[in-house]
Amino acid sequence: MKKKILFVINTLGGAGAEMALLELLEKLEKENEKTKDVQYEISLYVLMGQGELVKKLPKEVLLKNKSYQPLSVLQKEGRHFMYRTILKTMFVRGTVCCLLPYLLSSRADMLKRRKVLPDKLLWRVLSDGGERFAEEYDLAVAYLEGGSAYYIADHVRAKKKAAFIHIDYTKAGYTRKLDRDCYLKYDAIFPIGEDVKQQFLKVYPECAGRTKVFHNIIDTEKIKTKASLPGGFSDDFAGIRLLTVGRLTEQKSYPTAIRAMKKIKEKHKNVRWYVLGEGPERKRLEHLIDSLGLQEDFILSGSVENPYPYYKSADIYVHATGFEGKSIAIQEAQTLGLPIIASESNREQIENGVDGILCRLEPEAVSEAVCRMMEDEKLRNRYREASLKKNVVYEKDMELLTGLLFR
């Protein structure tokens, strides 16, 4: 018996949600290998038609895009392609004309809330201007908020529909008006953590009965294997290495980390902070680093193919970020046994004083937490052991998704 599943995601770049989707697709492919009774025929449609992770797509997954470019939206060429895609979709089926009242009304609502987010408006344009597929699917899955959620709700024929939520819904700027109540059209909604679930249900309380936590899937054995491969830090620095992994975006609050590093250097000279990731905030962050004289101390290392040898060689993992859901980077750091410092928004993953330190997202608080951990080797070792024990693999969550096919 074959079951047709369509996944839709906004882009296929190197962010945490996209990596989690690849792990989920690989898991479904392995399910196909285990049994012949039920076979999943899996398709993927990428709304923007771009992203560098396409090369890691499992071989049995059918990419539905008529045209696709393996370009990162963080690169110049990738951004140009993105702008062309947006312009093109504006004129497909008269999208802009049809959406004009919605766009004007939503923008006015944003102005009233003093939170204008043009990207949120563009997701509706991209959704309505996207490709159309005639076939009906047994299950259609929107793997991100915004465009993919709108697209499946309005433009995909499926017996069952499911949507994933990866972020703090209200802090990210979404509203029911912006969504056009799209989540009322879904049979199941999967926030990736309990905190994410509670924030979502504040906006959509009537969806409580169909909303269940579905944790990010990570392959711990693959992470450990890749951590043992050649790579990692290439400098000859012999001091304490702090590591952060994440795209250079406003959401990640890197200015807080940079200013915290300035305070750390006032007390400790033998420490460096490395960031793995690329993004639109690079120039602004470089300017701040230069202005504080931290060129040799706060290192923007860019994106790397295999970050795990860096985790393995780091002394402390620091995750001082703004709003997001459940961090895959923290899960990876726990898998490799790093002591972790994180901002208070990560309470679901870190128990303060038990398997890491939680602190306010302020330079003073972050610097105090880092200095405390740097100065206490026994504390670092205790948190290392706790991180290794903390890592949990959520195998049963798969049944939440595949179970929809038989209801």
Question: What is the predicted role of each segment?
Answer:
Residues 335, 339-342:
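Short hydrophobic beta-strand element within catalytic cores of glycosyltransferases
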Residues 44-51, 245, 249, 272-285:
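Glycosyltransferase donor-sugar binding loop
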Residues 228-229, 361, 378-407:
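A charged, aromatic-enriched C-terminal amphipathic alpha-helix characteristic of glycosyltransferases
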Residues 18-23, 240-263, 280-286:
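A conserved mid-protein helix/loop that constitutes part of the nucleotide-sugar donor-binding site
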Residues 352-353, 357-364, 372-377:
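Conserved acidic donor-binding segment of nucleotide-sugar-dependent glycosyltransferases
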Residues 160-166, 170, 184-225:
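Donor nucleotide-sugar binding/catalytic pocket of nucleotide-sugar-dependent glycosyltransferases
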Residues 308, 326-335, 347-348, 354:
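Short alpha-helical segment that forms part of, or immediately flanks, the ligand-binding pocket
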Residues 303, 322:
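Aromatic "clamp/platform" in nucleotide-sugar-dependent glycosyltransferases that forms part
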